[in-house]
């Protein structure tokens, strides 16, 4: 039995953090209704074996998974097709480095980082350099360029910037 586990204690989410996650999940849910894919809020965990052999449990703020049978117990063991993290002062560094690296190594095709204070969305797309996965910032969405906000790998899914941030003062 391998007990080489890694647990990261994270502070509780702010109300703004939860509002953005709820708004995102609500927008995407209906658009995936006739699909094999599902959108999940931040109560779903993924367990992966990292390249160094340690098992890592990660709970994204939101994810879209099209292989929902890939579970072990209460955890998904496959990689989702999309993950989203909402920044907070206590998680920003980890979301931008640790989680981003884990998601990249698990080859998750698309990663969004949302800054609720600045009302900015960073859109990262996975590509390969010398056969190694790497995220590239393909867009930064803010109030001034908010039109046409779509997921790269789910182009039929429309995200309304104003709805995403509704309820945030």
Regions found by a protein language model. Name each.
Residues 1-169:
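Gly/Pro/Ser/Thr-rich low-complexity, intrinsically disordered segments predominantly at protein N-termini
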